[in-house]
Amino acid sequence: MNSNVISSALKKLRKEYGLTQVDLAMKSGVGLNSVRELEQGKATVRMDKVAQVFDLFGYELVPQKKVK
């Protein structure tokens, strides 16, 4: 999964739930800068932060074999 997929999914979920980036940071316990970096598609974000944010929406990150 590349950073653009994560970024797009996070933005979509946040907007569907009517949350601002500040709201998302507060509710997930992740810093605002981390939320912004995730939504900007920064490739070097920490996986624990990604997992923490998606957990708020009921998602978990799991390894999945690539389809060739």
What does each of the following model-derived ranges do?
Residues L19-S34:
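Short alpha-helical DNA-recognition segment
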Residues A43-T44, V62-K68:
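Short, charged recognition helix plus adjacent turn
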Residues D48-P63:
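DNA major-groove recognition helix of helix-turn-helix/homeodomain DNA-binding modules
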Residues M1-V5:
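A detector for short, charged/polar N-terminal pre-domain segments
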